Amino acid sequence: MSTIDFEAKLYEINSWTILRLPEDASEKLPSRGMTMVSGTINGVPFKTLLEPDGRYAPGQKPSHWFRPDKTLLDDASAKAGDTVHVSLEPTKDWIEPEVPEDLKKALAASPKAEALWNDITPLARWDWVRWIRAVKTPATRQKHIDVALDKLNKGMRRPCCFNRNLCSEPYVSHNWVLIEPMQATEKMTT
């Protein structure tokens, strides 16, 4: 697949700096769901998971987004509000997800589930992590961890009934859709 080049504005949603791909750039990706990419921002290299923005209804233009970390932003001399030059190339080499501490602890207490966790692909681990983090309350999150352990103990390699095209990060989404920067500003002022 060829390199996808574009310019995009960095937005702040809540306290996170977000880069949302233009729809025409997102269209060139191999998947509407999460996609692993290598690329550059203002010439500074990175590798990350692109999350879907959750827009998929008729008439909507779906896209992807990611949260550049502080080091990448500093090295690229970029901040929220700036327009940056981005080059992306999809890759099949998936980086490991950051496993939340509560899930690490639960896996460590369940050797059978942990053994399967270590055997599944990084993509499958991303599915589990995204499914677990996609909830807002601690009680529901714990329920998702308990269900994940039960399924892993039964040999199930992926969560069931999880739409990979939705935005699974509750801090920057509402009803599984990435919050628009204007909505984030309106929420903060009301």
Task: Set out the residue ranges of the language-model regions.
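A conserved hydrophobic position in a structured secondary element of the catalytic/binding core
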Residues: L21, R67-P68
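Short glycine-/small-residue-rich flexible loop motifs, especially phosphate/cofactor-binding loops
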Residues: M36, K70, E114
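Mature exported/compartmentalized surface modules and terminal targeting/interaction regions
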Residues: M1, P62, K79, S87, ...
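Short alpha-helix capping/helix-loop boundary micro-motifs
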Residues: D69-D75
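Long, compositionally biased stretches
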Residues: M1-P62, A76-L103, C160
